[in-house]
Amino acid sequence: MAQDKENLIWIDLEMTGLDPEQERIIEIATIVTDKNLNILAEGPVLAVHQPNQLLDKMSDWCIKTHTANGLVERVKASKLTERAAELQTIDFLKLWVPKGASPICGNSVAQDKRFLFKYMPDLADYFHYRHLDVSTLKELARRWKPEISDGFQKANTHLALDDIRESIKELAYYREHFIKLD
């Protein structure tokens, strides 16, 4: 295990909703890959405690989804604060990627970054300012090469680690079928 500025940091957050001014982070996970998308390490998968009054105000979709996948119970049982989860995540990332080297990688990462800026600013600052957003390729493929856009199907568990693994596989799919490096 050694730091490499070419390694990529993949992240996913689960939140109580989409508005960082009203909602909070309830789960965070990270994976580090090399530049060729080979998984080097999985970081801690952390449920972040949030009070019941916040969880009770989630949308019907969030309540249904995060209850069905077990996340609500994990959040209620967790003792972790956002700050503790942030520090554990940074400690993991320091083993693999120098600060400021990797773009934030994943699906719709601009949304995750909004929450990181608000609730985990030191982690937000760990990333390069650029984004590697798989959803950009998904949108382009849907418009420019629709015959491949249905070729990758997600399980949609809405658990952070599962979502990251799917994002990495999805980018590999687009690399093979859409970008075609060879």
From Swiss-Prot:
EC numbers, comma separated: 3.1.15.-
Keyword field: Cytoplasm, Exonuclease, Hydrolase, Nuclease
Coiled coil segments of this chain: none
GO biological process, one term: DNA metabolic process
GO-annotated cellular components: cytoplasm
Transmembrane segments: none
General function of this protein: 3'-to-5' exoribonuclease specific for small oligoribonucleotides.
UniProt xrefs under NCBIfam families: PRK05359.1
Family: Belongs to the oligoribonuclease family.
Name of the protein in question: Oligoribonuclease
Source organism: Actinobacillus succinogenes (strain ATCC 55618 / DSM 22257 / CCUG 43843 / 130Z)
Lineage: Bacteria, Pseudomonadati, Pseudomonadota, Gammaproteobacteria, Pasteurellales
